Amino acid sequence: MAQKGQLSDDEKFLFVDKNFMNSPMAQADWVAKKLVWVPSEKQGFEAASIKEEKGDEVVVELVENGKKVTVGKDDIQKMNPPKFSKVEDMAELTCLNEASVLHNLRERYFSGLIYTYSGLFCVVVNPYKYLPIYSEKIVDMYKGKKRHEMPPHIYAIADTAYRSMLQDREDQSILCTGESGAGKTENTQKVIQYLAVVASSHKGKKDSSITGELEKQLLQANPILEAFGNAKTVKNDNSSRFGKFIRINFDVTGYIVGANIETYLLEKSRAIRQARDERTFHIFYYLLAGAKEKMKSDLLLESFNSYTFLSNGFVPIPAAQDDEMFQETLEAMSIMGFNEEEQLAILKVVSSVLQLGNIVFKKERNTDQASMPDNTAAQKVCHLVGINVTDFTRAILTPRIKVGRDVVQKAQTKEQADFAIEALAKATYERLFRWILSRVNKALDKTHRQGASFLGILDIAGFEIFEVNSFEQLCINYTNEKLQQLFNHTMFILEQEEYQREGIEWNFIDFGLDLQPSIELIERPNNPPGVLALLDEECWFPKATDKSFVEKLCSEQGNHPKFQKPKQLKDKTEFSIIHYAGKVDYNASAWLTKNMDPLNDNVTSLLNASSDKFVADLWKDVDRIVGLDQMAKMTESSLPSASKTKKGMFRTVGQLYKEQLGKLMATLRNTTANFVRCIIPNHEKRSGKLDAFLVLEQLRCNGVLEGIRICRQGFPNRIVFQEFRQRYEILAANAIPKGFMDGKQACILMIKALELDPNLYRIGQSKIFFRTGVLAHLEEERDLKITDVIMAFQAMCRGYLARKAFTKRQQQLTAMKVIQRNCAAYLKLRNWQWWRLFTKVKPLLQVTRQEEEMQAKEEEMQKITERQQKAETELKELEQKHTQLAEEKTLLQEQLQAETELYAESEEMRVRLAAKKQELEEILHEMEARLEEEEDRRQQLQAERKKMAQQMLDLEEQLEEEEAARQKLQLEKVTAEAKIKKLEDDILVMDDQNSKLSKERKLLEERVSDLTTNLAEEEEKAKNLTKLKSKHESMISELEVRLKKEEKSRQELEKLKRKLEGDASDFHEQIADLQAQIAELKMQLAKKEEELQAALARLDEEIAQKNNALKKIRELEGHISDLQEDLDSERAARNKAEKQKRDLGEELEALKTELEDTLDSTATQQELRAKREQEVTVLKKALDEETRSHEAQVQEMRQKHTQAVEELTEQLEQFKRAKANLDKSKQTLEKENADLAGELRVLGQAKQEVEHKKKKLEVQLQDLQSKCSDGERARAELSDKVHKLQNEVESVTGMLNEAEGKAIKLAKDVASLGSQLQDTQELLQEETRQKLNVSTKLRQLEDERNSLQDQLDEEMEAKQNLERHVSTLNIQLSDSKKKLQDFASTIEVMEEGKKRLQKEMEGLSQQYEEKAAAYDKLEKTKNRLQQELDDLVVDLDNQRQLVSNLEKKQKKFDQLLAEEKNISSKYADERDRAEAEAREKETKALSLARALEEALEAKEELERTNKMLKAEMEDLVSSKDDVGKNVHELEKSKRALETQMEEMKTQLEESEDDVQATEDAKLRLEVNMQALKGQFERDLQARDEQNEEKRRQLQRQLHEYETELEDERKQRALAAAAKKKLEGDLKDLELQADSAIKGREEAIKQLRKLQAQMKDFQRELDDARASRDEIFATSKENEKKAKSLEADLMQLQEDLAAAERARKQADLEKEELAEELASSLSGRNTLQDEKRRLEARIAQLEEELEEEQGNMEAMSDRVRKATLQAEQLSNELATERSTAQKNESARQQLERQNKELRSKLQEVEGAVKAKLKSTVAALEAKIAQLEEQVEQEAREKQAATKSLKQKDKKLKEVLLQVEDERKMAEQYKEQAEKGNTKVKQLKRQLEEAEEESQCINANRRKLQRELDEATESNEAMGREVNALKSKLRRGNEASFVPSRRAGGRRVIENTDGSEEEMDARDSDFNGTKASE
């Protein structure tokens, strides 16, 4: 892999440098500095280290410049460890926040890594430079790879979608979304490039770069569309000014079979004008820059600056040459199949569009009429498009229009002419673009193969915010809004809905990303209408303008949250919409014309009649022009691709685009979407620059963070149970028992066997869900398992092949030995004289016998040659006959074959007809059953209709009763109105009387308001109390007058109050009665509606049944048509059969004549002829039987067909009768429904009137009650004043009686006291009002604090407060009398108390604000803690995974150890066996050596006897002269000696043979010994290698365990850091809780003081105290929660400490184990050295054995030295035995050491296992405790959310109760409207039923006709069959006559043979004849 070694140039932009990620320095720096992210104005977020924490603020030091900054805790975001730097999938980040995501994207972007996974989708940042990551090498790298195997890339997304399409058989789509200039078009091209390579490389070509024609065209379609549809904008040099959806179709095997491109909303206005620094479409610049001189002259081209439509002249694009691009466009067009004529025609149209802009109109002097002074440009245009100049100018300047029935010429103004030219240019370019698109689609869909599935790629114009945003920008942004909503809905809503559907544990998360309000603002049709609907509506009005459209939009949508009117209006046609990507200001100028898109039909008709075929083809559908001018002329389109609209229908651009977009969204919803989020890094189009705030805004808008969060928290991978079992059962092979098992149960068993963590998966109803990465892990394990299985299979195969080769070699070895033995025997025999004599004599013995045999053979040969000649002549004759017969046979076989084929066809036809007949019969039976069911239902419906009629009568009676009750209510209402009028008159009188009081009260209220608004003025008025004493006397007189008036008014008010209370009680009773009646009416209406709905439901069921019946009738018609076709084919087959029969008859007669001619030749031919005649007769019989059976079948078919036709006609008549009954019942039901609807309307109107009157009465009652309460308040105030004045008067008179001398002084005192009293009264009133205001302010504050809890209580307490207020006022009246006596002394105390109260109130308000702020901070900290808890939960899950992985590895380690033990035991057994075999072979060798020695001794004895005999012979020869006499005796002794010599020789030979055999045996033994030694050495070596491999594996596992322990240590350190942070947060929480407790205690003290001081003044403060108590209770609960959290944290700390201790213990144990393993390894090394020494000794032994073999071979040559060599051998064998014994003792000692080492290893393993198990159990227990604590916290949180939800519910119920009465009338209205709509639906259904009945009648007539035709055809077939039978009979009789003549009796006798054989022969005979 490229990652391991040095990365290549292209791989640097794909792979991350792992050394940088795993840097220990960076890790240590991150841990030591406590690095975090803080907000930055320049970079978005900046790295900093925490230095100090001050409560809610933190002092941090910036990493970049070392500057210290104070930041709020809530503004800090966590930083990920360095190992997560440049991570490929941002879902893997431990700390997920905006800063981390931005940092990751920034780091990857600056490293050239532009692709990054973000959960389930991919994020792409535009690099603004070329990167070498799109080559063929990269394509091959990504081909067929899984997503996690390769770094992020657009190729990976494309490959995933392609593989998912092939595997799941689901359509896929790749959606590239983002702002304009983000790189959507480029990524779309790369997707197409990748698919073109991947989908065409399957076709078996060697060179994968060679793509097919279709793939080339698919790649070249994009450049053509870009040339004509892309342009340079401010943001993007190659901006798509149209949207396109590329649908690539694939067949089942994954080949591309075709493609189709759909486009959306071409920005055609760009063709006539462009903004500053922008270009029009590329093709104009390509043409002007790249055209050659000849083409320029042909197309009348000029320079860039001479064209008006090129607003900015020539605007170059950096790094792009227009002339080169022009050539590339032409090449692409030629590849797509555009010929040169078509290319030239397209360029002519492009040039004509440019020339249209150069036509200049001027205004005439005296009139507004336009004129064309210079028509040069017009001439050029007409030349290019092939029309007449004069006609063109006339059509532009004075077009003909239709006014009524007359056609007149209308002069155009300059503005109208300019507009007409611009509209023509836009329409021409749009039509050219559409033509090119249709031509491209035609080229891409050449194959006409059916695509199994498709992959769609969406490239649509990105979100645009320009300086001037027009109608095109609205449509583009509306499309992007819909796509973003699709993304949000797919990622967040559908995902969570699937979780809930499948029933897995999931809390629904609302991410708040719903864009529906913005979409509805644009597309909503009504209530209120959206932007597009209002635009369409304005287009209908002739006097409508863009300004009126915007005004109407503001009036309709002014209050919409997403609609704004700009603050600084540049133009009255501007408005703003808040999109998901930001606010966009739209300018609606010329929107009406853009939406209508009108055209001058005079010019279009000219273009339609153009002499240029291409232009005429472009304008051939002139009638289908969108616009108001063509409304009356619109007809169905002549284009095949155009949509067919009704005549006279007006379709606007907005409507068409909305429909197109709706279809696109429906297509996308039906596919599996793969999202690619393109991000623009900066607006300067500079590479290497990334604007942090711009990227952050795009990330927020696109929902990237939310997508990552749901990917992490959710279960994005899911798989169906059956597929999971099928795919991963190999991993848990023995988990599922044999037999049937439910898929879910099987998956549960498999999951248990796989030992997956329960947090990593969820089991639903039909699928199993996994977290990210789990399926990839399972796939890797599956691949490993499959590789192991395949390797085992390969090993078995190789073993089998090796054994087979070995057996073959053994066989070859034995064969070689046999050959060697034979050769050795021959070598021994060839020098033996007797053998030579035998070989010479034996041939001579047979010579005499051979001559006799030769003569006999010659005679036989002569006889045989004669016979052969005769046989040859006979054979020739027979061959001639055979050839003739073979020819005849072939002819007959061909005829028979043709007959059999015909018979088979007719049989198939018969079977088919029988099957169809059976199907028809089954359908008929079903129809009869359904008819019976329909009849039963009809009867039920009639019974229900009767019940309905009865119910209707009951309802009518009830309605009459209700009408009577309504009349009574109206009478009561009239009386109530009269009473109300009287009461109103009385109130008017009272108003007149109390007008003066009200004026004074208003003055006092104004003063109170002034006092409340300005406290400083109140203090100044308190200081100036002395100044007001002079006014006291005048005030006393005025108050006395007022007292009298007030007493009178009070009495009158009391009377009126009593009267009003009586009236009010009466009204309440009446209202209660009315409400009861209304409730009864509602119940009755509800019942009626239920009955109506039931009736409608029944009607719907009847209609559905009728539709089903109609469908079945249609199916029967189809069956009947099929039968008719089968009958026609049967007739044709019959005619064919008749013709063939005639031919057969003629051929039979010819054959018979030929047979008669050949019968006389031989007896064999006569027999053949007799057989053939028998076959002919059998054939005739078979034909007769066939015809009879066929006739019977035809008869049966006719009868059944007629029966079926009769049954169908009966069914049709029954259907007619049922339909008539249904129509009647439907009419009656409709009448009843109409009556019911009328009654419902009357009831609704009556109810509305009653409700209206009831509301009026309630309003009047409320007014009266308020007036009464006001009067009572005024009366109480006046009575207070009266009592005060009386007391004052009494005090003054007492003072006058006491001291008459001091009258003046007393008078002054009285005056001062009076003024003081007046002031104190005013102050009292002001204080009471202030108190009320303060209490109301307190309530408001408490209501704001507890708004979710107390709104219901406030409304209930309002009534109680009124009653309490009356009672408190009465109590205050009595108390004020007492308090006035000592008021002078207490007034100063009251002032002080007032000031103190004010101060305390201010302090309380401040405390409340502080508490609110503290509460907000607590909420923030709680949220932060919750996030940290979530991170801890994620860490816990990771820890659990680590523990489970460790357990798995421990188990694997145990298994490996067990396998090692087994293998070592096997090796020990094998070694024992080998040693036993060696011992056996040694004993055999010793026995052989003994035998050898014995043989040698025998040989020596023989030699000795031989020598003795030779000596005797020599003695005898020498003594011959001496003993010559006795010659006879000597001869005898010679003969005896010779015989003895021969015997001795034979014995010697035998002994030599024995010696040879022993030598051979010894050789074999040595060879076997060598082979065994070699095998033993190889086994030992293999075992050593296996042991070494296992040792390496163990070392590897130890290393892995060490790394895992290191990771665990790091994670523990992270957890410790998190714990410290949590402890700090807890300390902060404790401090906040302490401050809250202190504040609470101070508030309690202050409240107690207030209670002591304000017991007599205000009892309403009790409610405030109760609410405060509740706040304190909640604070106590918070304290408890904080304490519990602190306890939990302490527990966590203890657990962490225990875990750390356990980890240290485990580390120690691990080190001990490592030492023991090292010692065992050293022991093992010594054993290996010992083994090597033994091997060296064995090698020496082998060399010695080889030497012994050489010595043994020398023994065979030198027999004399055999004994010496045997002694040497015996000595060496003795030494070998001693060495073997030494080796055996050494081996035993090694075995003992090995056993001791094994026992030690087992003990160590047991200890390690026990310790590991104890630590794992402790960790699991701690994890369980932590989980319980987390669950407890979750339960508390759920309880809090439940209480909040309950309060919300209460609030909603109160609001619903408030609005219920208001909504009732609206509901009744809606019910009435629903009734009307239901009646309309019923009418529509009636009309549809009538149409269906007409269709049924027509179908019935058609069926009748077809049945008649079928019966006629059946009769004709019957006649034809009869004729055929008669013909067959006649033919058989005619052909049978000559056979009788020729055959005689023999033929007749042979006819008694088996009929079956004759039948078969007959069929063969007919077949051959027919074919001939």
UniProtKB/Swiss-Prot annotation:
GO MF term list: actin filament binding; ATP binding; calmodulin binding; cytoskeletal motor activity; structural constituent of muscle
Pfam family, one: Myosin_tail_1
Stretches with biased composition (Polar residues): 1771-1788
Region (C-terminal): 1935-1972
Modified positions (N6,N6,N6-trimethyllysine) in chain numbering: K129
Residue numbers bearing the Phosphothreonine modification: T1177, T1951
GO CC terms of this entry: brush border; melanosome; muscle myosin complex; myofibril; myosin complex; myosin filament; smooth muscle contractile fiber; stress fiber
Domain Myosin N-terminal SH3-like: 31-81
Coiled-coil region: 844-1934
Segments forming domain IQ: 786-815
UniProtKB keywords: Actin-binding, ATP-binding, Calmodulin-binding, Coiled coil, Cytoplasm, Methylation, Motor protein, Muscle protein, Myosin, Nucleotide-binding, Phosphoprotein, Thick filament
Modified-residue entries (Phosphoserine), positions: S8, S23, S40, S1684, S1722, S1954, S1971
Stored InterPro entries: Kinesin_motor_dom_sf, Myosin_head_motor_dom-like, Myosin_N, Myosin_S1_N, Myosin_tail, P-loop_NTPase
Domains (record comment): The rodlike tail sequence is highly repetitive, showing cycles of a 28-residue repeat pattern composed of 4 heptapeptides, characteristic for alpha-helical coiled coils. Limited proteolysis of myosin heavy chain produces 1 light meromyosin (LMM) and 1 heavy meromyosin (HMM). HMM can be further cleaved into 2 globular subfragments (S1) and 1 rod-shaped subfragment (S2).
Family to which the UniProt record says this protein belongs: Belongs to the TRAFAC class myosin-kinesin ATPase superfamily. Myosin family.
Quaternary structure (record): Muscle myosin is a hexameric protein that consists of 2 heavy chain subunits (MHC), 2 alkali light chain subunits (MLC) and 2 regulatory light chain subunits (MLC-2).
Purpose: Muscle contraction.
Name recorded for this polypeptide: Myosin-11
Origin organism lineage: Eukaryota, Metazoa, Chordata, Craniata, Vertebrata
Gene that this polypeptide is encoded by: Myh11
